[in-house]
């Protein structure tokens, strides 16, 4: 009997299973057989019981033991194949979210095959240098990736005890970031921007120039081959996608970049899986291949709107501005997949880009993102209108991990003090500028005029730099000292006397 069943499996047929015949145990036995169905030996279950289509969702009836998050393959009447995922299960009903959209689905003629597996993505080191669509299929006319592994796109939970606190500063070459909002390797820090601002140019500049300031002993390989970029675009236009692709090609880093592109004309629903595909690939490169991965996700606002669309189709109770109440949790499942893990040399640094609707930082998307991430880089429209690049407003910007990544032995011992003093002087300068608009320049004191001079030179010399100008952190600090010398020593109250006596004199540039 066992031998006959084995031959059946080899020949591609399903082994005959004993059929329950009546009795009180029959129903339980049938359920056990159905739940533990083995897809290697038994054919997959296919249904033509679509009862309705609502937005990106397909509702099926009379499904035998559907499972949450199970992948479903849909075949349309014209032979087109699409993929979906079970979002909700209620008895014999299943709600399936279709990644490629539901246009063209005929309720009577569409067949749905339940695979019995969750959504996995093939991963390989060969994915570097390749371009994929939002569902992970190659769109660069290259061959299908030969997978080294198939990983769950939701990722593996990381034991918090095994996380390493990010302490190595990444030098971006941008003074407003390196000097006052330093980024650590393994940090998640978003760029808060708005429509029409150069956030893509800033992200591309960070990709071009990013590198370690000090190389610690525990990291083995610092070669360029050990650095990788995973770029995920959600709902961006063709111009943005082409900009990043050409920028990576021009600076010779395309071989170390993996791109996932969901464009504005691609299905909205696909945007929900695009960042997860990118992060699963990044986790494989970081923790299996031990690479240092920079993940850029743009535009997270498009992702959140796709989430709202699914929520509305499911007729869930909406939260603020129509976004679902679980959006905070959902965003956390993306942002928290950054960091470093004990025993592995690799790391994942995340820079999500989001465009604030109507430049409103209190909008739910930037508001919830700010709670989860470790700071933000704020791109300001007023600075942009005055032709300042990069238009980073340092006052609302923040890096919560800066304190552990700077200082003696990591950057320079005066770094924290210079940053604090620059912040204080810039904030006072902004207040003086507002007061000048009310009372006029004649009513200002001599100290106020010094702050106004500092304000002008700070924006002109410190914040402003070229898109290909790569400043070291030491050059940034020296520019900071040049600006602080506008004030007499007595006015620099945020800097200790010992640091002032060492760096304030004109020849301190030699340090």
Curated annotation (Swiss-Prot):
PANTHER family reported in the protein's UniProt record: V-TYPE PROTON ATPASE SUBUNIT B, V-TYPE PROTON ATPASE SUBUNIT B, BRAIN ISOFORM
Binding sites annotated in the UniProt record for ATP: 400
UniProt tissue specificity: Kidney; found in early distal nephron, encompassing thick ascending limbs and distal convoluted tubules and in the alpha-intercalated cells of the cortical collecting ducts (at protein level). Expressed in epididymal clear cells (at protein level). Mainly expressed in the organ of Corti and spiral ganglion neurons, in both the early postnatal cochlea (P2) and the adult cochlea (P30).
Coiled coil location: none
Function recorded in the entry: Non-catalytic subunit of the V1 complex of vacuolar(H+)-ATPase (V-ATPase), a multisubunit enzyme composed of a peripheral complex (V1) that hydrolyzes ATP and a membrane integral complex (V0) that translocates protons. V-ATPase is responsible for acidifying and maintaining the pH of intracellular compartments and in some cell types, is targeted to the plasma membrane, where it is responsible for acidifying the extracellular environment.
This protein's name: V-type proton ATPase subunit B, brain isoform
Family according to the record: Belongs to the ATPase alpha/beta chains family.
GO biological process, one term: synaptic vesicle lumen acidification
Quaternary structure annotation from Swiss-Prot or TrEMBL: V-ATPase is a heteromultimeric enzyme made up of two complexes: the ATP-hydrolytic V1 complex and the proton translocation V0 complex. The V1 complex consists of three catalytic AB heterodimers that form a heterohexamer, three peripheral stalks each consisting of EG heterodimers, one central rotor including subunits D and F, and the regulatory subunits C and H. The proton translocation complex V0 consists of the proton transport subunit a, a ring of proteolipid subunits c9c'', rotary subunit d, subunits e and f, and the accessory subunits ATP6AP1/Ac45 and ATP6AP2/PRR.
Keywords tagged on the record: ATP-binding, Cell membrane, Cytoplasm, Cytoplasmic vesicle, Hydrogen ion transport, Ion transport, Membrane, Nucleotide-binding, Synapse, Transport
Record's subcellular location: Apical cell membrane; Melanosome; Cytoplasm; Cytoplasmic vesicle, Secretory vesicle, Synaptic vesicle membrane
Disulfide bonds: none
Major subcellular location class: membrane
Knockout-associated phenotype: Morpholino knockdown in the whole cochlea, especially in hair cells and spiral ganglion neurons causes a dose-dependent hearing loss.
GO cellular component labels: apical plasma membrane; clathrin-coated vesicle membrane; cytoplasm; cytosol; extrinsic component of synaptic vesicle membrane; melanosome; microvillus; myelin sheath
Keyword match Calcium: no
Molecular-function GO term, any one: ATP binding
Membrane topology listed for this record: Peripheral membrane protein
Encoding gene per record: Atp6v1b2
């Amino acid at each position: 009997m066992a031998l006959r069943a084995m031959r059946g499996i080899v020949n591609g047929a399903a082994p005959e299973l004993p059929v329950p015949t009546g009795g009180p145990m029959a129903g339980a036995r049938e359920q056990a057989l159905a739940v533990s169905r083995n897809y290697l030996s038994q054919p997959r279950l296919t249904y033509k019981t679509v009862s309705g289509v609502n937005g990106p969702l397909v509702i099926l009836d009379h499904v035998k033991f559907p499972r949450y998050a199970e992948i479903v393959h849909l075949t349309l009447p014209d032979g087109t194949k699409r993929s979906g995922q079970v979002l909700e299960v209620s008895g014999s009903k299943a709600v399936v979210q279709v990644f490629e959209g539901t246009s063209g689905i005929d309720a009577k003629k569409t067949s749905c095959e339940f695979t019995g597996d969750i959504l996995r993505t093939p991963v390989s080191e060969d994915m570097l240098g390749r371009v994929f669509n939002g569902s992970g299929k190659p769109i660069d006319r290259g061959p299908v990736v030969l997978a080294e592994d198939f990983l769950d796109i939701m990722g593996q939970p990381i034991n918090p005890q095994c996380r390493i606190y990010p302490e190595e500063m990444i030098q971006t070459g941008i003074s407003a970031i390196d000097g006052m909002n330093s980024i650590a390797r393994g940090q998640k820090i978003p760029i808060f921007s708005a429509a029409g601002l150069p956030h893509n140019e800033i992200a591309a500049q960070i990709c071009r120039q990013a590198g370690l300031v000090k190389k610690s002993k525990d990291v083995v390989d610092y070669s360029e081959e050990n650095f990788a970029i995973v770029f995920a675009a959600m709902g961006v236009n063709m111009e943005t996608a082409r900009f990043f692709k050409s920028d990576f090609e021009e600076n010779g880093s395309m071989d170390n970049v993996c791109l996932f592109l969901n464009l504005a004309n691609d299905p909205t629903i696909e945007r929900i899986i695009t960042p997860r595909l990118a992060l699963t690939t990044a986790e494989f490169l970081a923790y299996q291949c031990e690479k240092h991965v920079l993940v850029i996700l743009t535009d997270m606002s498009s992702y959140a709107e796709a989430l709202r669309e699914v929520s509305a189709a499911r007729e869930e109770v909406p939260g603020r501005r129509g976004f679902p109440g679980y959006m905070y949790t959902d965003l956390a499942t993306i942002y928290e997949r950054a960091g470093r893990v004990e025993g592995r040399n690799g790391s994942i640094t995340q820079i999500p880009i989001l465009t604030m609707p109507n430049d409103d930082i209190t909008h739910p998307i930037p508001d919830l993102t700010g709670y989860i991430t470790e700071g933000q880089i704020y791109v300001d429209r007023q600075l942009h209108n005055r032709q300042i690049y990069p238009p980073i407003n340092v006052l609302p910007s923040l890096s919560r991990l800066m304190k552990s990544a700077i200082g003696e032995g990591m950057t320079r011992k005066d770094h924290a003090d210079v940053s604090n003093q620059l912040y204080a002087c810039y904030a006072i300068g902004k207040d003086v500028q507002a007061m000048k608009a009310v009372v006029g320049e004649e009513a200002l004191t001599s100290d106020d005029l010094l702050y106004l001079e500092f304000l002008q030179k700070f924006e002109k010399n410190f914040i402003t730099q070229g898109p290909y100008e790569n400043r070291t952190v030491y050059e940034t600090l020296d520019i900071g000292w040049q600006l602080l010398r506008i004030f007499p020593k007595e006015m620099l109250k945020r800097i200790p006397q010992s640091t002032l006596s060492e760096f304030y004199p004109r020849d301190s540039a030699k340090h």
